[in-house]
Amino acid sequence: RLQTNPLQQIQVALGFETVGRGHADNEAIKLLASILGGTMSSRLFIEVRERRGLCYTVRAAVDSYDDVGTFVIRAGLDASRLKLAMDVIVKEVKKIAAHGVTKEELAMAKDHVRGGLMLRLEDSSERAEFFGRQSLFFNEVIGPEDRLKQFDAVTVADVARVAKQILDMKAMSIAAIGPYKNAKQLLAQFPTL
């Protein structure tokens, strides 16, 4: 989907379908998102923003619904840099799908999840939401430590498996807002998938 905007900045999203809420692979998928684009030490942030200065922002995130989920990579950049940025992003996606992640990357992602959850739970409204969502969506409540144990149980092999399953370039969807007049003009900026 393309929405035209006369500004020279473009917002682009690359989307992949994932599993629904409550699926056993959810923790591995969330850790994959953290490693690929969830922090300032993530692969995409380092390669696309820090090393090459191609975008203002780049990140990966997961949203889970009852029966399906989305794994989305978002980038905001100058339209003149789109082709080069997409080359780098697609290369990193293919690399993580083909070769998985390292033990060090997984350990850092688990630390990020642990730190983020513990920080969130210091706020009483966030704490209420944490427990309320579980009660509403799963009809059971898992405490923070047990929730973190689910993330701790994820292995390098688990992340490699979900990366290979989810990050299929042929099944990727693209959405963008930018100065392109038509989808063909936009798609010419993407590497051959």
Residue ranges with predicted function:
Residues A13-V19, R49-V154, M169-I177:
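M16 family metallopeptidases and their MPP-like homologs
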Residues K30, V159, I174:
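Short, conserved catalytic/metal-binding micro-motifs enriched in Asp/Glu and His
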Residues A24-E27, S124-S125, Q185-A188:
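Short conserved micro-motifs at the rims of enzyme active sites and ligand-binding pockets
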Residues V154-K164:
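A short, acidic, amphipathic alpha-helical segment used as a generic capping/interface helix at domain edges
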Residues R1-R43, Q150, Y180:
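His/Glu-based metal-binding/catalytic segments typifying zinc-dependent metallopeptidases
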Residues H23-A24, R81-A85, A183-Q185:
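Short, conserved charged micro-motifs
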Residues R1-L2, D168-L193:
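Proteolytic maturation boundary segments
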